Amino acid sequence: MDLPAPIHDFLLVFLGLGLIVGGLGVVLLTNPIYSAFSLGLVLVCISLFHIPANSHFVAAAQLLIYVGAINVLIVFAVMFMNGSEYYNDFHLWTVGDGVTSLVCTSIFVSLITTISDTSWYGIIWTTRSNQIIEQDLINKGQQLGIHLSTDFFLPFELISIILLVALIGAIAMARQ
């Protein structure tokens, strides 16, 4: 996707803020369900980073695999656990929390300085799918990826939503 530079920068900043907010939600929220949903936000933002880089199939695959499978599995596992054990013995701040905050803050600052010093416009990300087809360099796996991300995208997404609804219904019936 060839976006103008200001829109590209805004999109990257917006997705980066989504990553930061979601990561803070995973770490700071005491309810494990809310933490799992924050993890879902992080995984969605990570997969959306591939769209400006013309890697639409990678974005869709990561969205389906990580958000559609891994995060749903985490939510179901948390739903089956006893929720009362998370609220006992809640300490406001410990030494381990301080050390972890210091390490994470230093890693965050080093990443921010590295990202701001990198020239992102000189990087060649990927080729477009129509150029790959024209070069006749594709194998069966690449053809499948191209068709799933173009021709069969809507049916593929609808099947995944139907499977998700069936899983949620099965879990709800099993809990009763």
Swiss-Prot record:
It catalyses: a plastoquinone + NADH + (n+1) H(+)(in) = a plastoquinol + NAD(+) + n H(+)(out); a plastoquinone + NADPH + (n+1) H(+)(in) = a plastoquinol + NADP(+) + n H(+)(out). It is a multi-pass membrane protein. Its EC number is 7.1.1.-. The keyword Iron does not apply. GO terms for cellular component: chloroplast thylakoid membrane. It is found in: Plastid, Chloroplast thylakoid membrane. Keywords: Chloroplast, Membrane, NAD, NADP, Plastid, Plastoquinone, Quinone, Thylakoid, Translocase, Transmembrane, Transmembrane helix, Transport. It comes from the Eukaryota. The chain crosses the membrane at residues 10-30, 33-53, 61-81, 92-112, 152-172. Its main location: plastid. NDH shuttles electrons from NAD(P)H:plastoquinone, via FMN and iron-sulfur (Fe-S) centers, to quinones in the photosynthetic chain and possibly in a chloroplast respiratory chain. The immediate electron acceptor for the enzyme in this species is believed to be plastoquinone. Couples the redox reaction to proton translocation, and thus conserves the redox energy in a proton gradient. Belongs to the complex I subunit 6 family. This is NAD(P)H-quinone oxidoreductase subunit 6, chloroplastic. The gene is ndhG.
